Amino acid sequence: MFGDEKRYPSKSIAEVANICRGASPRPISDYLTEDVNGVNWIKIGDISIDDIYVTHTAEKITKEGAKKSRYVTPGDFILSNSMSFGRPYILGIEGCVHDGWLIISDYQESLNTLFFYYELRANQVQSQFNALANGTTVENLNTDLVKGVNIIVPSIELQNKFADYAQFCDKFGFV
């Protein structure tokens, strides 16, 4: 990617986005619903490892349960924070997330969504996640750790070009 920090500015994720942790209504079984008007309940099992976007959920929670969780909207990122930590996904749907997710939002002023996705997946960011998570009993990330991760922030024009190229490669199976 754009790895030259001398040529492109480096910023912490906290400088360009808001980060918070998901929350779970407890006990969750009291808030699950089959009502079509329920709120999407986004879980790791709804997403395959190769997915970029979250487009569906298997379960929904009640509106009361949503008040005790974290609401997310299309374009927000969710980042797994334990076990297979550091995997980013772009939301294509509205819903709520539990405390196994970190939410990254309000980044659009500084970052192209697709560029940001590939940057979060890049070795230079993943190695920071790994270093931060090592040493804990169960390897995991939290909001304070992720806030301090540094990313390269080239001009939005270069980010857009990168995103266009990545979409082209993905469309034709080059990625």
Whereabouts are the PLM-identified features?
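Intrinsically disordered, low-complexity boundary segments flanking structured domains
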Residues: M1-G3, R26-Y31, P88-L91
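Sequence-specific dsDNA recognition surfaces
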Residues: A14-Y31, G45-P74
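A short beta-sheet element
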Residues: K43-I44, H56-R121
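Non-catalytic DNA-recognition/assembly elements of restriction-modification systems
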Residues: M1-P25, G148-V175
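Basic, amphipathic alpha-helical recognition segments used for DNA target recognition
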Residues: I13-N18, S48-V54, I90-E94, L102-E157
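Alpha/beta-hydrolase fold active-site loops
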Residues: V39
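Glycine-centered loop/turn positions within well-structured domains
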Residues: A23, F85-G86, S127
